[in-house]
C-alpha cells in the first residue's frame, strides 16, 4: 500500500539541500537527442536559491554522453560536487550536469536549467508541456482573479493608468501584481522594447519603457492557461512606481526585482 504524505515531504541533506520526490514525467533534450527521460525525478532546493532544480536516477540519464568536466565550476553551492560535460553530436556543453556528495542523493545526476554553470539542455518537458527557466515549484501558487478595485498608477507624479477592472495576480513570494486593460493605460507615454522574459508559471512577457524608466511595463500576449485572465493586459513593477488601490497608497515592496528596475 502506498502512503502519500499530507504535508510537504521535504528531506534535508548535511550540506543544506532540501529535496523531495516528484511523480512528474520529466524529459530533457539537446537538439534531437533525449538526454534525460525519468518518471522518478527528485526536486532539489539549494541554500538561498528560491527555485528548485531536478536530479535524476542514473538509469534515467544518458551517461554515455557525459564526460568528466575539463573546467569544473567553482563558487557558491559547488562544494564537493563532481561536474560533467555533455557531448552530443560533436557539441560539448561544459558543466551541464553534476552529482551531489550527499548520501541521500547518491545515484542521482542533476542538470542546470537556469544556466549558472554551462549552457544546459535545449528543451525540458514535464509530461507533455515544455517548461522554461526552471522547474515549477509544487508548493508555489499563481492565481489570476478578476477584480473591481480602483487602481491608479503614477510615475514621477504623472498618472499613467487608472482602472476599476483590474485582474489581480497573486504569486507566492511576490507582491500582488495589478494587470490593467490597455484602454486604461496611457500607452502613448510608453515605447515598446525588444526585451522579453520567460516565466515557468506565466509564459513570455514583452516590455515597454518610458522616460528614464526602462522595461517598467509588461504584458503576456500568450500566457499559460493557468493565468489566461491576464492575456494582453498590462502590469507595472510595484517596486518602481506608485500604486494606489481604493484610495490607499501602497508601499513599494522590496523584492528580488528591487534595484533591477527604476
Predicted regions mapped to residue ranges:
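Terminal leader/tail segments of proteins
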Residues: 1-262
Amino acid at each position: 500500500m502506498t502512503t502519500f504524505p499530507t504535508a510537504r515531504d521535504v528531506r534535508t541533506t548535511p550540506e543544506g539541500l532540501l529535496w523531495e520526490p516528484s511523480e512528474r514525467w520529466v524529459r530533457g533534450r539537446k537538439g534531437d537527442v533525449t538526454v534525460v527521460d525519468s518518471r522518478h525525478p527528485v526536486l532539489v532546493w539549494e541554500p538561498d536559491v528560491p527555485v528548485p532544480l531536478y536530479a535524476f536516477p542514473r538509469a534515467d540519464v544518458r551517461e554515455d554522453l557525459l564526460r568528466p568536466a575539463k573546467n569544473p565550476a567553482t563558487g557558491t553551492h559547488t562544494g564537493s560536487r563532481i561536474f560533467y560535460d555533455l557531448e552530443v553530436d560533436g557539441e560539448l556543453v561544459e558543466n551541464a550536469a553534476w552529482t551531489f556528495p550527499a548520501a541521500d542523493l547518491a545515484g542521482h545526476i542533476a542538470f542546470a536549467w537556469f544556466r549558472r554553470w554551462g549552457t544546459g539542455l535545449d528543451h525540458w518537458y514535464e509530461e507533455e508541456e515544455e517548461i522554461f527557466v526552471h522547474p515549477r515549484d509544487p508548493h508555489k501558487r499563481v492565481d489570476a482573479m478578476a477584480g473591481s478595485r480602483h487602481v491608479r498608477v503614477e510615475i514621477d507624479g504623472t498618472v499613467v493608468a487608472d482602472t476599476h477592472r483590474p485582474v489581480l495576480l497573486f504569486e507566492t513570494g511576490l507582491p500582488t501584481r495589478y494587470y490593467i486593460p490597455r484602454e486604461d493605460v496611457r500607452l502613448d507615454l510608453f515605447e515598446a522594447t525588444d526585451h522579453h522574459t520567460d516565466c515557468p508559471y506565466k509564459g513570455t512577457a514583452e516590455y515597454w519603457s518610458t522616460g528614464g524608466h526602462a522595461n517598467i511595463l509588461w504584458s503576456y500576449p500568450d500566457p499559460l492557461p493557468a493565468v489566461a485572465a491576464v492575456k494582453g493586459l498590462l502590469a507595472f513593477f510595484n517596486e518602481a512606481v506608485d500604486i494606489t488601490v481604493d484610495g490607499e497608497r501602497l508601499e513599494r515592496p522590496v523584492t528580488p526585482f528591487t534595484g533591477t528596475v527604476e
